[in-house]
Regions:
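Active-site gating loops and adjacent loop-to-helix segments of metal-dependent hydrolytic enzymes
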Residues: 72-104, 142-148, 212-255, 330-342
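C-terminal cap of metal-dependent C-N hydrolases
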Residues: 374-429
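His/Asp/Glu-enriched, well-ordered alpha-helical/loop segment
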Residues: 227, 250-254, 296-387
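Active-site beta-loop-alpha junctions enriched in small/polar residues
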Residues: 68, 126-127, 146-150, 181-183, ...
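Histidine-rich, glycine-flanked metal-binding segment
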Residues: 1-3, 11-59
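Histidine/acidic residue-rich metal-binding segments in metalloenzymes
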Residues: 49, 130-136, 159-280, 292-308
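Alpha-helical scaffold segments that flank or form the walls of functional sites
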Residues: 57-58, 75-137, 160-171
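Histidine-centered catalytic micro-motifs
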Residues: 60-72, 204-213
């Protein structure tokens, strides 16, 4: 048994614990509470243990709910600044086609995420060489095979069989799923059948939604279902202003086993649809800014009660894979958009941990993660944040926590440890 104690422990599903501790054995959490109580309980039971103490913050490992690890080698694109999705895509495509070692790049991205305190990832894979990134890195999360550019005719001929084979070949653990890229990049038939493929296997769905301004609803709401359009683009070509969220909802894509990335171009009705379907939104504000999109409606999501998670996206559209940098940007946006409640830091930290786990169905069951509780896997992140009053410390972590991760444990195993953490605790990764 090992006890991990810290000046402040943040369980997420329980109140913050100053001078708190958790006890870990067999890769799982056995006790959570005040350090004196945890130590007393173990001694009273005659359980031998050693202790690792960090004079800072201990939190659950971060959960990155939207990424493309294979694009880690495309940081030159992410360092640019663009005037919208099409402008960014014009820069992305030639670099993508130049050829990369996708496996090596994805592995490098996984290491970077772990060093930043991340223990679970929603990773979208476009090229099969990158398919084992999460598995090889022993990260929790879901590997999603990306599905795009299928017409109805090609799908009927060979699409379903090909996609099923790709899905079934993904290495596990972690979990697996499919990512129908976006409403505008697939015809109707694949969008109808991909959810069935996933749900027959008990897998997960993840798609880009509300990332391109083209998806935004415009004009009066007009019934369109009887038109039986071949695709979202065909529907728009016929003059309908139906939004992409309503479109995929009618096709049965959304649900509690699905989460979306970005959610920038969302009306109040769109946001209500997501709530009604139990679909989480993974917000990626730094990626949106690089691409030149509008700001996501962070304050509206918070006020209306949408389930939220946080993602970095990839280095092809983001400055780093440090999730707390996106959390800080969400804090800035929420305040600028008029969210004044004092619970903002707590809500955003929850989104970056439990919210991401919930988005992928990892918050329940035997391998539950995203929070510190008895029976959960011991996915831990230690941060070099000075501890003062509890609320002020949490706000410091949220607003200025990027770059502060000093150690990351996955299943109770030290996977990253800074020199400062090793000097203080003796623990090496």
């Amino acid at each position: 048994m090992r006890v991990y104690s810290a000046s402040l422990v943040l369980p997420i599903t329980a109140p913050p614990i100053p001078c708190g501790a958790i006890a870990v054995a067999g890769g799982r959490i056995r006790h959570v509470g005040d350090r004196e109580w945890v130590v007393h309980e173990l001694r009273a039971r005659g359980v031998a243990f050693d202790e690792v103490h960090w004079p800072g913050v201990l939190a659950p490992g971060l959960v990155n709910a939207h990424s493309h690890l294979q694009y880690t080698g495309m940081a030159e694109v992410g360092r640019g600044s663009y005037a919208g999705f099409d402008d960014w895509d014009d820069a992305f495509t030639p670099v993508y086609r130049a050829g990369h070692d996708w496996a090596q790049d994805a592995a490098a991205g996984a290491r970077e995420m772990i060093a930043a305190g991340t223990t679970a990832v929603a990773d979208i894979v476009t090229d099969v060489e990158a398919a084992s990134a999460l598995h090889d890195a022993r990260l929790h999360g879901i590997t999603y095979w990306e599905v795009m550019s299928w017409t109805n005719a090609a799908w009927a001929e060979r699409g379903r069989a090909e996609v099923e084979a790709r899905l079934d070949a993904l290495p596990s653990p972690p979990g697996t799923g499919l990512s129908p890229h976006a409403p505008y990049s697939l015809d109707v038939e694949p969008l109808l059948e991909i959810p069935d493929i996933v749900r027959e296997r008990g897998s997960r769905l993840h798609l880009h939604l509300g990332e391109a301004a083209f998806e935004r609803e415009h004009g009066e709401a007009v019934p369109w279902q009887k038109q039986r359009p071949a695709s979202f683009r065909a529907l728009r070509d016929e003059g309908f202003g139906t939004g992409a969220t309503e479109f995929v909802d009618e096709l049965g894509v959304l649900g509690p086993d699905c989460h979306i990335a970005h959610g920038v171009y969302m009306t109040a009705r769109d946001r209500a649809i997501l709530r009604a379907r139990g679909t989480t939104v993974a917000l990626c504000p730094r990626s949106n800014a690089v691409i030149g999109l509008d700001e996501p409606p962070v304050a509206a999501y918070l006020v209306e009660g949408n389930a939220l998670a946080v993602g970095t996206d990839s280095l092809a559209s983001s400055p780093s894979l440090d999730l707390l940098a996106d959390v800080a940007e969400l804090h800035r946006l929420a305040r600028a958009q008029g969210y004044v409640n004092r619970d903002l830091p707590e809500l955003l930290l929850r989104a970056a941990t439990l919210g991401g786990a919930h988005a992928m169905g990892l918050d329940t069951g035997p391998a539950r993660t995203g929070y510190l509780a008895v029976g959960a896997v011991a996915d831990l992140a230690f941060f070099d944040i000075p501890v003062s009053e509890v609320d002020a410390t949490i706000e410091h972590l949220v607003v200025a926590g990027a770059g502060s991760a000093v150690a990351t444990f996955i299943d109770g195993e030290a996977r990253s440890a800074s020199p400062a953490f090793t000097r203080e605790t003796g623990v090496r990764a």
